[in-house]
Amino acid sequence: MLVANYSSDSEEQENSQSPNIQPLLHTENLAPAVVDNVKDDLIVSKGGNSRELARNVPVNEMVQPALGPANPFVTKEQDSIKNSITGYAEREYVPNFVFNQEYYANTHAIYGKRNFDDNEATTSTDLKRKSQKIKERREDPGDPSILEGDGAYKGPWAGYGSEQSSSPLEYSEYEEVESLDVKSEKDTESNNLGQNELLKEQLATPEVETHRSKEETILHKDRLFDYQNRSYMHVPNDVGINLSEEPGEQTCYIPKKHIFTWKGHTKGISCLRFFPISGHLLLSGSMDNQIKIWEVYHDRSLLRTFQGHARPIRDLSFSQDGRSFLSTSFDKTIKLWDTELGKCLNCFNSDRLTNCVKFQVDPDKPNEFLAGTADKRILQFDIRSPDIVQAYDHHLGGINSITFLENGKRFVTTSDDSSMRFWEYGTPVPIKFVADIAMHSMPRVALRPNGKSIACQSLDNCIYVYSAYEKYRQNKKKVFKGYSCSGYSLEVGFSPDGRFVFSGDSSGNACFWDWKTCKLMAKLPAHSGPVQSMAFHPQETSKVATSSIVDGSIKYWD
């Protein structure tokens, strides 16, 4: 019988003498050998051409001296590498938009916290304090048992004290008046007045001061009427051309030479307007605050001067029959003048700077006109009343131009907000809004004689064309280039037959384009400065008047 785990003594002896044999395992290290140079890591490259770092180097290593031992007698800031007094400055090219965004984001940290108005709350504590002050100024609601007399019941209809009756605008003006002592020092008579009377007198003057001048006129002829009792308003019949025809029936050409110069203004001329239909008179407004009317035929002399504005003339507009015209100036007034007698018939004071003015072209509304102001509004007036009839206020910037469409039923306006809006006349809501991120401000707009297109002078040195009816879309096939406006508001217009487009140049050139091909046909060196105003004669084939804002001369071309 076999016993489990049975073994003899001889077998144990053999097992003790045999060696313990184990298999050999060969392991391999696949990582490459890396030399850990601790000293090399502590050394910072100080090469003059080195612009890159392979690791994040501490600041104390970056600013330590390149060579030599450390100086124990200087501070850490003095021992650093600097190319200026305060530190190390490097040249960096940053766009203006990015710089302004970063700079003005920390304006409050540079200039401190702005001063808030008394009526403006900044924190929740200020809101509570403000509401408490309002409650303290609240009048006594009274006794419910008393209906009339002293102590009568007012309830929730009780008013506030005298402090609350002042508007926030008056508070802000009061603070501004207290900080300004220039006028009181110059005026010796104001020192005799009481402080309260002086403040009332200064607060009574509006922030936008309107300058009103006395209207005068000067006739530069011996007499107004001739032997047949005709004034210069009479359309001449002895000039070799019928001036009573409808403009545009003639074939127009580009002028080639300078034939005459009108001189009389002492400063630059801002606008030119030919007499409607006949064009036998030329109206000019200048930076010398004067308006002059010139004779286009015969001796081409100065006929009359209109004086009544305290600031330079901004825009002019003839009425439909030409017997009167509107003028707007930087003195924030709009005046209606009699073309023949030179009298000021009416003055429309809007207390705002008016950039443009335009008479209504609808024959049924000859007494109405529109004015575009710098405070984003278009005002509608009637010459028989100085009050505002209607206001259009959807623009976000100052109004630059007003152009009537579809025989006065609609009109289009352009603004500093780089947008164009189409309106129904009499309705203060735009029917079409044109704006794009690539659009620039378009300060001048002109309607083509056929009434189907408008040309817009853009500040990106191009003239764009839009349809003047139905959907009012841009005609992208027609873009007129080849001139530079340099930010100036330069006149743009059409020849009477619509064949050519003209505009001024910032270099003093008068530019002409072909309407069909959009090709620049001619550049006439007209003036030494920007040609701000140009006017094509409504009856002649190739006569154009030009003026500049740098000289007081009007040049006539043929």
Curated annotation (Swiss-Prot):
Q: List GO BP terms, alphabetically.
A: mRNA cis splicing, via spliceosome; mRNA splicing, via spliceosome
Name the segments for region: Disordered: 1-23, 117-197
Matching entries from InterPro entries are given as: G-protein_beta_WD-40_rep (IPR020472), PRPF17 (IPR032847), WD40/YVTN_repeat-like_dom_sf (IPR015943), WD40_repeat_CS (IPR019775), WD40_repeat_dom_sf (IPR036322), WD40_rpt (IPR001680)
Swiss-Prot/TrEMBL WD repeat ranges: 264-304, 308-349, 351-391, 394-433, 437-476, 484-523, 526-558
Q: Which GO terms describe its cellular component?
A: catalytic step 2 spliceosome; nucleus; post-mRNA release spliceosomal complex; Prp19 complex; spliceosomal complex
**Where is the protein situated, by its record's location annotation?**
Nucleus
Q: Name one GO molecular function term.
A: mRNA binding
Keywords, comma-separated and alphabetical = mRNA processing, mRNA splicing, Nucleus, Repeat, Spliceosome, WD repeat
List the biased-composition ranges (Low complexity). 162-171
Composition bias, Basic and acidic residues: 126-141, 180-189
Which Gene3D superfamilies does the annotation name?
A: YVTN repeat-like/Quinoprotein amine dehydrogenase
Superkingdom of origin: Eukaryota
The protein's predominant localisation is: nucleus
Q: What does this protein do?
A: Functions in the second step of pre-mRNA splicing. Involved in splicing intron which are longer than 200 nucleotides.
Q: Quaternary state and partners of this protein?
A: Belongs to the 40S cdc5-associated complex (or cwf complex), a spliceosome sub-complex reminiscent of a late-stage spliceosome composed of the U2, U5 and U6 snRNAs and at least brr2, cdc5, cwf2/prp3, cwf3/syf1, cwf4/syf3, cwf5/ecm2, spp42/cwf6, cwf7/spf27, cwf8, cwf9, cwf10, cwf11, cwf12, prp45/cwf13, cwf14, cwf15, cwf16, cwf17, cwf18, cwf19, cwf20, cwf21, cwf22, cwf23, cwf24, cwf25, cwf26, cyp7/cwf27, cwf28, cwf29/ist3, lea1, msl1, prp5/cwf1, prp10, prp12/sap130, prp17, prp22, sap61, sap62, sap114, sap145, slu7, smb1, smd1, smd3, smf1, smg1 and syf2.
- What's the protein here called? Pre-mRNA-processing factor 17
Species of origin? Schizosaccharomyces pombe (strain 972 / ATCC 24843)
